[in-house]
Amino acid sequence: MSQAGVKTKQAGKIVQIVGPVMDVAFQPGSMPNIYNALIVKGRNGAGQEVSVVCEVQQLLGDGLVRAVSMSATDGLMRGMEVTDTGRALSVPVGPTTLGRIFNVLGEPVDNMGPVGNEKTLPIHREAPAFVDLDTKLSIFETGIKVVDLLAPYRRGGKIGLFGGAGVGKTVLIMELINNIAKAHGGVSVFGGVGERTREGNDLYMEMCESKVINKADVKSSKVALVYGQMNEPPGARMRVGLTALTMAEYFRDVNNQDVLLFIDNIFRFVQAGSEVSALLGRMPSAVGYQPTLATEMGGLQERITSTKDGSITSIQAVYVPADDLTDPAPATTFAHLDATTVLSRNLAAKGIYPAVDPLDSTSTMLQPWILGDDHYGTAQRVKQTLQRYKELQDIIAILGLDELSEEDRMIVARARKIERFLSQPFFVAEVFTGAPGKYVPLAESIQGFKLILSGELDSLPESAFYLVGNIEEAIAKAASIQAAAAAAAAA
């Protein structure tokens, strides 16, 4: 944590340590405020230097405060001196954070030296005032056809990303980071909350490989990474989301940029709060969760919004414990979401990427008075066609296509073209596939699907629609396939 400009206020002593929670005694009349950062410095039993940052959670009275540690409490002893910094945890913000990896305290952990930035902000801040909010409903164009057409993101909204292992969450996240930088001139902040350290490392390596992070010129990178992985104490996992959000708020409020904030995984934020709550002695609520669950979630989510200066659009991976959507943690999260993007293993198995399920993914923005009748009508017709195809699949599997009516055969043919046209080559996957990435503007996406639905392209082969950008590319690909087939027949 940057201590620049922090005036040391008061000193206290540790009187009790219970795991990551400690009680500290201060002189009466010199108590720290709630959320103040405390620093414990001293030597452990082996004579080694220890330095731990804690956050005040409760004022117990008689000079006693209860604080939660942001790192391991190994080596701490009763009687050690504790210093009140007089302010909340503060983290570096601004362009120098791009391309770097930070921990919950805002300390770089990527072995690339100090950030060289004296500008810091406290992680606990008020949500923007109502008069500062931008209440105009507008969609956030991603350049990804399936998202923009069927489950569009709201500018300044919150999106839940649901998907198991290996269906393409990471690649979709990296493509969104890449596209917001190119199309919106925006930046991204990634908050790794309570997930695997290996996944955090893999994400960093893949970002370097796909040039989302440019190690040769770090300042040209498009993303800042903040990690508090599952090996960290619950205090760090509970606060790392706020650290990432604070960095994103600076880009929105000071640089007036559109920012993407990724939180992976929002459930772990709740889980960490539950662990801390029990250690603080609070009475548990439903299913053992903390009684302050809705308040903690609201405190984070209400800061993620559009203002008149810029926007923070948040994409949050949501783990659903035991696939129970009524569990208090995912149920509380759903109340804040504007859209859901569901990744399907069946589509991934077919090789259709991004493997976004067009029928399960939803958005509150899919309304004719927001999108216009053209977009809304096209999206509804695409969904109806795909739904009918899904209903017919059992019949096809048992009896075959020949037993279907003429109309149903036509629906199946168009649905298969639509399914393939929903796939798209990604910029960040170029290094793996060799196919150049495509950014498809919304108007071109709508035009393409309207042409497929109208029947004008019924004569084109299905394969022409697979992994292309706009419809002109599909038509050109069909022409080259037919030319190659004619040449082969002539030979």
Curated annotation (Swiss-Prot):
NCBIfam families the UniProt entry points to = atpD
**One of the record's GO molecular function terms:** ATP hydrolysis activity
User: What processes does the entry annotate via GO biological process terms?
Assistant: proton motive force-driven mitochondrial ATP synthesis
Q: Primary place of residence?
A: plastid
SMART domains for this protein = AAA
Please give the catalytic activity noted in the UniProt record: ATP + H2O + 4 H(+)(in) = ADP + phosphate + 5 H(+)(out)
Q: What is this protein called?
A: ATP synthase subunit beta, chloroplastic
| Gene3D superfamilies for the chain | 2.40.10.170, Bovine Mitochondrial F1-atpase, Atp Synthase Beta Chain, Chain D, domain 3, P-loop containing nucleotide triphosphate hydrolases
Can the keyword Ligase be found in this entry's annotation?
no
Q: Give the protein family.
A: Belongs to the ATPase alpha/beta chains family.
A GO-annotated cellular component = chloroplast thylakoid membrane
The EC number of this protein is 7.1.2.2
What membrane topology term does the record carry? Peripheral membrane protein
Question: Where found, per UniProt?
Answer: Plastid, Chloroplast thylakoid membrane
**The organism of origin for this protein:** Nephroselmis olivacea (Green alga)
One Pfam entry name:
ATP-synt_VA_C
Q: Where ATP is bound, by residue?
A: 163-170
